[in-house]
């Protein structure tokens, strides 16, 4: 326990930042709305109405004062209804735009102390900068190396916090600027009250949709709290040589923690500390889904589940449903993770041993980590995006029919190449051919819809090869990467795993 207290004290150094005055600086909003900055991190850029509006200190001050008024929320909702039917000039979208921009600027500001902490931590540990934003594909070689030697796996869905106040409490030990915390609390309660006004229960969904950057920052800080003691015990038990598997894949592993966690551990976890100091525990997470695997028995995994449930209950003050943590044997279980269907196969082999004049057969078993393309979820994603029917029958994309022929083919080709690139690590790529067929025929039918023709007539007139330039096969891409003298055979590349180091997020069509 003394080691835990020292670890907490070391990683909980208070932040003495005065962040609130930065909210009145105009350049903050330039950073908040810079598409290139948004593209460098893991959030999609958000399009705002009225991009050409300019900010000033007076305007921001007036907006903040007005946002703190009690009738501001009611005014927004009433003005929205009036504008919808009466077309008033003081539109809801104008006020919503300014409110969004202040919220977006605030999200940039609160990231500043954690970015500085991340840089200093990386320099202390001598972590290369290229690994600081590592590819999400770097998780799979780690799983490929470890899972085949383990016995049990637990598939975990990290629960969302029930109340937004929990997120504010998490940040209190990191940000000691009281006005900034009050403003954060206001934003969170504003979205919660807005959902009550419009009779909606999707508070977290609406908040994450309207301000993705701030939501993911708060969610990552919350997840890092969930993982904090797990990382501590893992550091005490073993040393991970693979830095890519523990190097802030989402810039989410921050270090400040709350003081009363020591009391929580002393009072509530003294009976559950001993079983989790096992060096054979392996933990991987992406977004809200985590994988916990061990060579130990089923009882050990049940103790880990007991630890997680009690930690969430006593530290975050909410109960986690047991069904969120499934414990299964790796030999009889397949699970979805990051768009792949993962499993461990058993390949029996018979080895003939010759000793002098006697020979005998030795039966042996080799475990193999298998990565499968989930064809049914992929077809479901294509169906939701209106590329095909639910049964996989290709259809045209009417919303793209007004684009030029080049843009239509380029968009379909980009989706096809992205899927081929992401699933280059699959052990069986034949399933991807059906997805490529759906996209090609959907592209042909979209072009035929634009030219008021049929897909068959279009293909007969232009030929089957006119799409090949855009729907580049993975083997053709690899031919430019690997020299001809290499031992790697492109003919068998559909059976080879190729993990890419330039993929920082999953494509929208991938089921995650």
Curated annotation (Swiss-Prot):
It is found in: Plastid, Chloroplast. GO terms for molecular function: RNA binding. GO terms for biological process: mRNA processing; RNA splicing; tRNA processing. InterPro entries: Domain_X, Maturase_MatK, Maturase_MatK_N. The keyword Iron does not apply. GO terms for cellular component: chloroplast. Keywords: Chloroplast, mRNA processing, Plastid, RNA-binding, tRNA processing. Belongs to the intron maturase 2 family. MatK subfamily. Usually encoded in the trnK tRNA gene intron. Probably assists in splicing its own and other chloroplast group II introns. This is Maturase K. It comes from Lilium longiflorum.
């Amino acid at each position: 326990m003394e080691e835990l207290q020292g670890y907490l004290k070391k990683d909980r150094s208070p932040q003495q930042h005065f962040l609130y005055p930065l909210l009145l600086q105009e350049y903050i909003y330039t950073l908040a709305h810079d598409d290139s900055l948004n593209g460098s991190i893991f959030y999609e850029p958000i399009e705002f109405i009225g991009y050409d509006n300019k900010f000033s200190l007076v305007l921001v001050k007036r907006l903040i004062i007005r946002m703190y008024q009690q009738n501001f929320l009611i005014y927004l909702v009433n003005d929205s209804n009036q504008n919808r039917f009466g077309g008033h000039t003081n539109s809801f979208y104008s006020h919503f735009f300014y409110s969004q921009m202040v919220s977006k600027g605030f999200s940039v500001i609160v990231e500043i102390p954690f970015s500085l902490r991340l840089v200093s931590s990386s320099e202390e540990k001598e972590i290369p900068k290229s690994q600081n934003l590592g590819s999400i594909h770097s998780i799979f070689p780690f799983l490929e190396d470890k899972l085949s030697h383990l016995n049990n796996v637990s598939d975990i869905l990290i629960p969302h916090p029930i109340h937004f106040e929990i997120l504010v409490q998490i940040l209190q030990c990191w940000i000691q600027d009281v006005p900034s915390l009050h403003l954060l609390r206001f934003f969170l309660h504003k979205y919660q009250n807005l959902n009550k006004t419009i009779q909606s229960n999707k508070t977290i969904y609406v908040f994450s949709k309207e301000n993705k950057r701030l939501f993911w920052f708060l969610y990552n800080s919350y997840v890092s709290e969930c993982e904090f003691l797990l990382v501590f015990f893992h550091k005490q038990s073993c040393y991970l040589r693979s830095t890519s598997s523990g190097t802030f894949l989402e810039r989410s592993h921050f270090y400040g923690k709350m003081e009363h966690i020591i009391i929580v551990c002393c009072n509530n976890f003294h009976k559950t500390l001993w079983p989790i100091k096992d060096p054979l525990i392996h933990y991987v997470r992406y977004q809200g889904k985590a994988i916990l695997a061990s060579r130990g028995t089923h009882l050990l995994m049940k103790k880990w589940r007991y630890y997680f449930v009690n930690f969430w209950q006593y530290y975050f003050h909410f109960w986690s449903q047991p069904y969120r943590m499934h414990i299964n044997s790796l030999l009889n279980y397949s699970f979805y993770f990051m768009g792949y269907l993962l499993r461990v196969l058993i390949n029996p082999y018979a080895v003939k041993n010759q000793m002098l004049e006697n020979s005998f057969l030795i039966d042996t078993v080799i475990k193999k980590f298998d990565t499968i393309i989930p064809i049914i979820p992929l077809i479901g994603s294509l169906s939701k995006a209106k590329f095909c029917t639910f049964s996989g029958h290709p259809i045209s994309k009417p919303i793209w029919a007004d684009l030029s022929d080049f843009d239509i083919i380029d968009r379909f080709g980009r989706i096809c190449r992205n899927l081929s690139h992401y699933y280059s690590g699959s052990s069986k790529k034949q399933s991807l051919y059906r997805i490529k067929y759906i996209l090609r025929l959907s592209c042909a039918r979209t072009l035929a819809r634009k030219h008021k023709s049929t897909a068959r007539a279009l293909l007969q007139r232009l030929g089957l090869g006119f799409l090949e330039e855009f729907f580049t096969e993975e083997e053709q891409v690899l031919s430019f990467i690997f020299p001809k003298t290499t031992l790697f055979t492109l003919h068998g590349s559909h059976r080879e795993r190729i993990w890419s180091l330039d993929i920082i997020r999953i494509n929208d069509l991938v089921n995650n």
